[in-house]
A protein has these predicted regions:
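Short, aromatic/basic amphipathic alpha-helical patches
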Residues: 20-22, 41-49, 83-89, 105-110, ...
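NAD(P)-dependent short-chain dehydrogenase/reductase
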Residues: 106-172, 199
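N-terminal Rossmann/SDR dinucleotide-binding element
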Residues: 1-66
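Flexible, charged surface loops at secondary-structure boundaries
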Residues: 1-4, 25-26, 62-70, 86-92, ...
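Conserved Rossmann-fold NAD(P)-dependent oxidoreductase catalytic core, especially the SDR/UDP-sugar
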Residues: 59-60, 64-125
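Short, well-ordered alpha-helices that flank and scaffold nucleotide-derived cofactor binding pockets
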Residues: 18, 22-26, 166, 170-173, ...
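Amphipathic terminal alpha-helices
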Residues: 2-7, 21-33, 241-286
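Mid/C-terminal beta-alpha module of Rossmann-like enzyme folds, strongest
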Residues: 171-246, 264, 268-284
């Protein structure tokens, strides 16, 4: 009989951390969280815990053991007083570190089993670690009634934190080990101009909704932007200039392959970017 997996999460004070908790509560896993987050999660998800199959534990209630999985989210620190002298050095404990790619941090991967870099995430709350500084700049300009400005010619491969969390949980709930290195992003390239156009329209509609001052322009259906879909496999010619590299989408084939082995679906983000942009801007106009 299959045993419910034990998943330890550290670094939950982020949009992607919240999304992971929400998604795991739809499974039968044992979820282990830091003591400081335990009571808030217990209260916030009381209904899911009462009627669902997932069980919640604080870190000092369930120790690391062989076969458990530990996902570290963000930049840390990740240690808990209950970890003891050995910390994460437990035989058979799979350690996955996931970090925002845009920060360009160098990680010593000797102590982790997998390093996952997430590109162009659209978090549903303001997040200085995971959110794009360029997105933050655009929202600041829009709120000041200014036209968002372009910065270079970089493209973005936007992806919702909901889709990223879903992919992570599909892997965490499976018997498949996380690949040693993994990159996550959306599959479609968005130019800055396309993103600004879409974001400006959504911002205008949101502000009109708050004030009740709608115009025909706000209520007219916006055309769907022409977005290019790229192959999952990226095989760049070398050497590449910095500008060429900024146009190159992360190689998603390892992510797609492991998800395909798990359930046959592969990497197919379901949240439309227009919806993800709407989720992302809401916290800026509260």
């Amino acid at each position: 009989m299959r045993q419910a997996p034990v998943i330890h999460l550290r670094g939950l004070d982020s949009s992607i951390g919240h999304a992971l908790v929400e998604r795991i509560f739809r499974t039968d896993a044992h979820l282990v969280v830091p003591r400081k987050n335990y009571r808030d999660i217990l209260q916030r998800y009381a209904t899911e815990l009462e009627f669902g199959e997932c069980e919640l534990h604080a870190a000092d209630q369930l120790d690391f053991a062989s076969g458990h999985r530990l996902m570290l989210i963000g930049l840390g620190p990740f240690d808990e007083p209950s970890d003891g002298e050995n910390g994460f050095e437990v035989d058979g404990l799979e350690i996955i570190l996931t970090a925002p790619a845009h920060l360009g941090i160098e990680v010593d991967t000797e102590w982790v089993d997998s390093l996952v870099l997430v590109h162009d995430l659209l978090p549903r709350v303001k997040d200085s670690t995971w959110g794009s500084s360029l997105f933050n700049q655009w929202m600041t300009q829009l709120n000041a009634h200014e036209l968002p400005s372009l910065k270079g010619e970089t493209k973005h491969w936007w992806v919702s934190d909901i889709d990223v969390a879903d992919a992570f949980v599909r892997m965490l709930m499976s018997d498949e080990a996380f690949p040693g290195q993994l990159k996550v992003s959306g599959r479609r390239a968005w130019s800055q101009a396309q993103t600004i156009e879409e974001l400006s329209l959504l911002h205008a509609r949101t502000m009109a909704g708050r004030t009740g001052q709608f115009s025909v322009e706000h209520l007219t259906a916006a055309p769907t932007p022409s977005i290019e879909v790229k192959s999952l496999i990226v095989s760049p010619s070398t050497p590449m200039s910095r500008e060429e590299n900024s146009q190159q989408r992360p190689d998603l084939s390892p992510l797609h392959d492991v998800l395909f082995r798990i359930d046959g679906d592969g990497w197919r983000p379901l949240v439309p970017i227009r919806t993800a942009l709407m989720h992302a801007l809401v916290d800026y106009v509260q």
